Amino acid sequence: MEVTLKRSAALARQTTPLLRPLRPVATYPSNNNNNNNPTPQQRRPYSLFSSLTRPPPNYPGHVPLSFVEKTALAIGSGLISLKNPRRGDLIATFAETTSTPYFIYRLRDAMLSSPTGRRILRDRPRITSTSLNLPYLRSLPPNTVGHTYISWLDREGVSPDTRSPVRYIDDEECAYVMQRYRECHDFYHALTGLPVVREGEVALKAFEFANTLLPMTGLSVFSLVGMKKKERERFWGVYGPWAVRNGLRAKEVINVYWEEVLEKDVGELRKELGVEVPADLREMRRREREEKKRREAAARG
Protein backbone atom coordinates (compact mmCIF):
# COMPACT_ATOMS: atom_id res chain seq x y z
CA MET A 1 0.00 0.00 0.00
CA GLU A 2 2.79 2.45 0.93
CA VAL A 3 4.62 1.69 -2.32
CA THR A 4 1.46 2.41 -4.30
CA LEU A 5 0.97 5.79 -2.60
CA LYS A 6 4.57 6.83 -3.32
CA ARG A 7 4.20 5.91 -7.00
CA SER A 8 0.94 7.86 -7.23
CA ALA A 9 2.56 10.94 -5.70
CA ALA A 10 5.51 10.71 -8.08
CA LEU A 11 3.17 10.38 -11.05
CA ALA A 12 1.18 13.42 -9.91
CA ARG A 13 4.35 15.51 -9.72
CA GLN A 14 5.34 14.49 -13.25
CA THR A 15 1.95 15.04 -14.87
CA THR A 16 0.96 18.35 -13.17
CA PRO A 17 4.06 20.60 -13.33
CA LEU A 18 1.96 23.74 -13.90
CA LEU A 19 0.42 23.40 -10.45
CA ARG A 20 3.78 24.04 -8.83
CA PRO A 21 4.62 27.65 -7.86
CA LEU A 22 6.43 29.54 -10.64
CA ARG A 23 9.44 31.17 -9.01
CA PRO A 24 13.10 31.65 -9.94
CA VAL A 25 15.23 29.03 -8.28
CA ALA A 26 18.05 31.44 -7.39
CA THR A 27 15.77 34.10 -5.96
CA TYR A 28 14.63 32.53 -2.73
CA PRO A 29 16.28 30.05 -0.40
CA SER A 30 14.88 26.53 -0.47
CA ASN A 31 12.78 25.17 2.40
CA ASN A 32 15.27 22.34 2.60
CA ASN A 33 16.91 22.24 6.02
CA ASN A 34 20.30 21.91 4.36
CA ASN A 35 19.98 25.42 2.86
CA ASN A 36 19.34 27.56 5.92
CA ASN A 37 22.19 29.93 4.97
CA PRO A 38 21.50 31.17 1.42
CA THR A 39 24.33 32.80 -0.47
CA PRO A 40 24.41 36.57 -1.09
CA GLN A 41 23.52 35.82 -4.73
CA GLN A 42 20.38 33.97 -3.57
CA ARG A 43 19.41 36.79 -1.23
CA ARG A 44 20.15 39.55 -3.81
CA PRO A 45 19.53 38.14 -7.31
CA TYR A 46 18.43 41.45 -8.79
CA SER A 47 20.27 44.73 -9.27
CA LEU A 48 17.62 46.66 -7.32
CA PHE A 49 18.17 46.64 -3.59
CA SER A 50 15.47 47.06 -0.99
CA SER A 51 16.00 48.30 2.54
CA LEU A 52 15.98 44.67 3.64
CA THR A 53 18.42 43.29 1.08
CA ARG A 54 20.90 46.17 0.64
CA PRO A 55 24.47 44.88 1.16
CA PRO A 56 26.36 46.02 4.24
CA PRO A 57 28.70 49.03 3.81
CA ASN A 58 32.32 48.36 2.90
CA TYR A 59 33.65 51.26 4.98
CA PRO A 60 32.25 53.91 7.37
CA GLY A 61 29.79 56.15 5.54
CA HIS A 62 29.53 53.89 2.47
CA VAL A 63 26.10 53.69 0.80
CA PRO A 64 25.86 50.67 -1.55
CA LEU A 65 23.84 51.44 -4.69
CA SER A 66 22.49 49.23 -7.45
CA PHE A 67 23.33 50.04 -11.05
CA VAL A 68 19.90 51.59 -11.60
CA GLU A 69 20.14 53.70 -8.46
CA LYS A 70 23.65 54.86 -9.31
CA THR A 71 22.63 55.77 -12.86
CA ALA A 72 19.61 57.77 -11.68
CA LEU A 73 21.70 59.57 -9.08
CA ALA A 74 24.38 60.39 -11.67
CA ILE A 75 21.88 61.85 -14.13
CA GLY A 76 20.03 63.88 -11.50
CA SER A 77 23.11 65.27 -9.77
CA GLY A 78 24.77 66.06 -13.10
CA LEU A 79 21.83 68.03 -14.48
CA ILE A 80 21.23 70.02 -11.30
CA SER A 81 24.91 70.80 -10.74
CA LEU A 82 25.15 72.12 -14.31
CA LYS A 83 22.29 74.47 -13.55
CA ASN A 84 23.64 75.41 -10.12
CA PRO A 85 27.45 74.94 -9.97
CA ARG A 86 27.49 76.10 -6.34
CA ARG A 87 25.96 72.79 -5.24
CA GLY A 88 29.20 71.17 -4.13
CA ASP A 89 27.33 68.23 -2.65
CA LEU A 90 25.81 67.33 -6.00
CA ILE A 91 29.10 67.82 -7.82
CA ALA A 92 30.69 65.39 -5.36
CA THR A 93 27.85 62.91 -5.91
CA PHE A 94 28.20 63.13 -9.68
CA ALA A 95 31.95 62.58 -9.41
CA GLU A 96 31.47 59.39 -7.40
CA THR A 97 28.63 57.89 -9.42
CA THR A 98 30.39 58.42 -12.77
CA SER A 99 33.90 57.40 -11.75
CA THR A 100 33.16 53.67 -11.84
CA PRO A 101 33.71 51.15 -13.26
CA TYR A 102 36.73 52.50 -15.16
CA PHE A 103 37.94 55.98 -14.30
CA ILE A 104 38.63 55.73 -10.57
CA TYR A 105 40.44 52.42 -11.12
CA ARG A 106 42.60 54.06 -13.77
CA LEU A 107 43.50 56.79 -11.27
CA ARG A 108 44.20 54.18 -8.59
CA ASP A 109 46.45 52.28 -10.99
CA ALA A 110 48.31 55.52 -11.77
CA MET A 111 49.05 55.81 -8.05
CA LEU A 112 50.12 52.19 -7.83
CA SER A 113 52.56 52.71 -10.71
CA SER A 114 54.35 55.48 -8.78
CA PRO A 115 56.51 54.89 -5.67
CA THR A 116 55.10 58.07 -4.12
CA GLY A 117 51.56 57.11 -5.08
CA ARG A 118 51.98 53.72 -3.44
CA ARG A 119 53.18 55.38 -0.24
CA ILE A 120 50.15 57.66 -0.25
CA LEU A 121 47.85 54.65 -0.61
CA ARG A 122 49.67 52.90 2.20
CA ASP A 123 49.77 55.88 4.59
CA ARG A 124 46.28 57.23 3.79
CA PRO A 125 47.02 60.85 4.83
CA ARG A 126 44.14 63.32 5.11
CA ILE A 127 44.30 67.04 4.31
CA THR A 128 42.60 69.11 7.01
CA SER A 129 43.32 72.31 8.88
CA THR A 130 44.56 70.20 11.79
CA SER A 131 46.79 67.81 9.87
CA LEU A 132 48.48 70.66 7.97
CA ASN A 133 49.08 73.02 10.93
CA LEU A 134 48.00 76.20 9.14
CA PRO A 135 49.75 78.62 11.54
CA TYR A 136 53.04 76.89 10.72
CA LEU A 137 52.41 77.28 6.99
CA ARG A 138 51.99 81.03 7.45
CA SER A 139 55.45 81.17 9.02
CA LEU A 140 57.15 79.58 5.99
CA PRO A 141 59.04 81.69 3.41
CA PRO A 142 56.80 83.18 0.68
CA ASN A 143 58.36 81.05 -2.07
CA THR A 144 57.45 77.72 -0.44
CA VAL A 145 54.59 75.43 -1.37
CA GLY A 146 53.12 75.66 2.12
CA HIS A 147 53.08 79.47 2.20
CA THR A 148 51.70 79.64 -1.35
CA TYR A 149 48.91 77.27 -0.32
CA ILE A 150 47.91 79.08 2.88
CA SER A 151 48.12 82.47 1.13
CA TRP A 152 45.74 81.20 -1.52
CA LEU A 153 43.34 79.88 1.15
CA ASP A 154 43.39 83.22 2.99
CA ARG A 155 42.95 85.26 -0.19
CA GLU A 156 40.04 83.16 -1.44
CA GLY A 157 38.43 82.70 1.97
CA VAL A 158 38.22 78.91 1.84
CA SER A 159 39.12 76.09 4.23
CA PRO A 160 40.51 72.57 3.70
CA ASP A 161 37.78 71.21 6.01
CA THR A 162 34.89 71.56 3.57
CA ARG A 163 35.39 68.44 1.44
CA SER A 164 32.51 65.95 1.52
CA PRO A 165 33.30 62.36 2.51
CA VAL A 166 33.05 59.74 -0.23
CA ARG A 167 29.89 57.61 0.01
CA TYR A 168 28.99 55.95 -3.29
CA ILE A 169 32.18 54.20 -4.43
CA ASP A 170 32.08 50.52 -3.45
CA ASP A 171 35.78 49.70 -3.42
CA GLU A 172 37.32 50.97 -0.18
CA GLU A 173 40.72 51.79 -1.68
CA CYS A 174 39.19 53.59 -4.66
CA ALA A 175 37.03 55.55 -2.24
CA TYR A 176 40.20 56.83 -0.61
CA VAL A 177 41.63 57.75 -4.03
CA MET A 178 38.56 59.91 -4.69
CA GLN A 179 38.83 61.46 -1.22
CA ARG A 180 42.50 62.22 -1.82
CA TYR A 181 41.75 63.85 -5.17
CA ARG A 182 39.01 65.91 -3.54
CA GLU A 183 41.20 67.13 -0.69
CA CYS A 184 44.12 67.96 -3.03
CA HIS A 185 41.95 70.21 -5.21
CA ASP A 186 42.92 73.40 -3.35
CA PHE A 187 46.61 72.57 -3.79
CA TYR A 188 45.98 72.53 -7.55
CA HIS A 189 44.38 75.96 -7.19
CA ALA A 190 47.39 77.26 -5.29
CA LEU A 191 49.85 75.70 -7.73
CA THR A 192 48.17 77.34 -10.72
CA GLY A 193 47.00 80.53 -8.99
CA LEU A 194 43.44 80.13 -10.30
CA PRO A 195 40.76 81.69 -8.05
CA VAL A 196 37.53 80.06 -6.86
CA VAL A 197 35.31 82.19 -9.10
CA ARG A 198 33.31 80.15 -11.59
CA GLU A 199 35.64 81.00 -14.44
CA GLY A 200 38.66 79.84 -12.46
CA GLU A 201 36.96 76.62 -11.39
CA VAL A 202 36.10 75.73 -14.98
CA ALA A 203 39.69 76.33 -16.08
CA LEU A 204 41.05 74.16 -13.27
CA LYS A 205 38.50 71.41 -13.93
CA ALA A 206 39.59 71.37 -17.58
CA PHE A 207 43.19 70.94 -16.41
CA GLU A 208 42.14 68.13 -14.05
CA PHE A 209 40.19 66.38 -16.80
CA ALA A 210 43.22 66.34 -19.09
CA ASN A 211 45.32 65.03 -16.20
CA THR A 212 42.95 62.58 -14.44
CA LEU A 213 40.18 61.80 -16.99
CA LEU A 214 37.52 61.90 -14.25
CA PRO A 215 34.17 62.50 -16.03
CA MET A 216 32.98 65.08 -13.51
CA THR A 217 35.88 67.38 -14.35
CA GLY A 218 35.05 67.15 -18.05
CA LEU A 219 31.36 67.85 -17.49
CA SER A 220 32.25 71.06 -15.66
CA VAL A 221 33.40 72.57 -18.95
CA PHE A 222 29.78 72.52 -20.15
CA SER A 223 28.94 75.12 -17.51
CA LEU A 224 30.52 77.60 -19.94
CA VAL A 225 27.06 77.80 -21.50
CA GLY A 226 25.82 79.81 -18.53
CA MET A 227 28.81 82.17 -18.39
CA LYS A 228 29.18 85.65 -19.85
CA LYS A 229 30.41 86.13 -23.39
CA LYS A 230 33.70 87.71 -22.22
CA GLU A 231 34.32 84.78 -19.88
CA ARG A 232 33.69 82.23 -22.62
CA GLU A 233 36.01 84.10 -24.97
CA ARG A 234 38.69 84.22 -22.29
CA PHE A 235 38.36 80.48 -21.66
CA TRP A 236 38.62 79.48 -25.31
CA GLY A 237 41.37 81.97 -26.01
CA VAL A 238 43.52 81.65 -22.87
CA TYR A 239 42.56 79.15 -20.19
CA GLY A 240 41.18 76.29 -22.26
CA PRO A 241 44.36 75.85 -24.34
CA TRP A 242 46.46 76.28 -21.19
CA ALA A 243 44.43 73.60 -19.37
CA VAL A 244 44.70 71.01 -22.14
CA ARG A 245 48.40 71.65 -22.79
CA ASN A 246 49.42 71.52 -19.13
CA GLY A 247 47.05 68.75 -18.07
CA LEU A 248 48.30 66.39 -20.75
CA ARG A 249 52.02 67.02 -20.35
CA ALA A 250 52.15 67.34 -16.55
CA LYS A 251 52.91 64.40 -14.32
CA GLU A 252 49.98 62.81 -12.47
CA VAL A 253 49.23 65.46 -9.83
CA ILE A 254 47.42 62.85 -7.72
CA ASN A 255 50.87 61.40 -6.93
CA VAL A 256 52.19 64.50 -5.18
CA TYR A 257 52.67 63.88 -1.46
CA TRP A 258 51.76 67.46 -0.54
CA GLU A 259 52.44 66.97 3.13
CA GLU A 260 56.11 66.28 2.30
CA VAL A 261 56.72 69.21 -0.08
CA LEU A 262 55.33 72.08 2.00
CA GLU A 263 58.82 73.54 2.53
CA LYS A 264 59.84 73.04 -1.10
CA ASP A 265 60.22 75.98 -3.49
CA VAL A 266 56.93 76.25 -5.36
CA GLY A 267 58.63 77.24 -8.62
CA GLU A 268 60.82 74.16 -8.44
CA LEU A 269 57.79 71.93 -7.87
CA ARG A 270 55.97 73.45 -10.83
CA LYS A 271 59.00 72.77 -13.00
CA GLU A 272 59.22 69.15 -11.80
CA LEU A 273 55.55 68.55 -12.51
CA GLY A 274 55.54 70.41 -15.82
CA VAL A 275 52.89 72.96 -14.83
CA GLU A 276 52.92 76.54 -16.12
CA VAL A 277 51.20 79.35 -14.22
CA PRO A 278 48.46 80.84 -16.42
CA ALA A 279 47.71 84.54 -16.72
CA ASP A 280 46.40 86.06 -13.49
CA LEU A 281 42.64 85.70 -13.84
CA ARG A 282 41.73 88.06 -11.03
CA GLU A 283 43.99 90.74 -12.49
CA MET A 284 42.46 90.29 -15.95
CA ARG A 285 38.96 90.61 -14.51
CA ARG A 286 39.99 93.70 -12.53
CA ARG A 287 41.41 95.42 -15.62
CA GLU A 288 38.28 94.54 -17.53
CA ARG A 289 36.06 96.15 -14.87
CA GLU A 290 38.20 99.29 -14.82
CA GLU A 291 38.09 99.55 -18.60
CA LYS A 292 34.32 99.19 -18.53
CA LYS A 293 34.04 101.99 -15.95
CA ARG A 294 36.22 104.27 -18.07
CA ARG A 295 34.08 103.66 -21.14
CA GLU A 296 30.91 104.34 -19.19
CA ALA A 297 32.39 107.53 -17.72
CA ALA A 298 33.47 108.69 -21.17
CA ALA A 299 30.00 108.00 -22.55
CA ARG A 300 28.39 110.08 -19.80
CA GLY A 301 30.90 112.93 -20.13
Swiss-Prot record:
InterPro entries: Coq4, Coq4_euk. One of its GO terms (cellular component) is extrinsic component of mitochondrial inner membrane. Its cofactor is Zn(2+). Pfam families: Coq4 (PF05019). It catalyses: a 4-hydroxy-3-methoxy-5-(all-trans-polyprenyl)benzoate + H(+) = a 2-methoxy-6-(all-trans-polyprenyl)phenol + CO2. Residues 38-48 have a biased composition (Polar residues). It is an enzyme of class 4 (lyase). Its main location: mitochondrion. One of its GO terms (biological process) is ubiquinone biosynthetic process. It is found in: Mitochondrion inner membrane. Pathway: Cofactor biosynthesis; ubiquinone biosynthesis. Zn(2+) binds at residues 185-186, 189, 201. The keyword Transit peptide applies. Residues 14-48 are annotated as: Disordered. Keywords: Lyase, Membrane, Metal-binding, Mitochondrion, Mitochondrion inner membrane, Transit peptide, Ubiquinone biosynthesis, Zinc. Its EC number is 4.1.1.130. It comes from the Eukaryota. Belongs to the COQ4 family. Lyase that catalyzes the C1-decarboxylation of 4-hydroxy-3-methoxy-5-(all-trans-polyprenyl)benzoic acid into 2-methoxy-6-(all-trans-polyprenyl)phenol during ubiquinone biosynthesis. PANTHER family: UBIQUINONE BIOSYNTHESIS PROTEIN (PTHR12922), UBIQUINONE BIOSYNTHESIS PROTEIN COQ4 HOMOLOG, MITOCHONDRIAL (PTHR12922:SF7). Component of a multi-subunit COQ enzyme complex, composed of at least COQ3, COQ4, COQ5, COQ6, COQ7 and COQ9. This is Ubiquinone biosynthesis protein COQ4, mitochondrial. It comes from Podospora anserina (strain S / ATCC MYA-4624 / DSM 980 / FGSC 10383) (Pleurage anserina). The lineage of its organism: Eukaryota, Fungi, Dikarya, Ascomycota, Pezizomycotina.
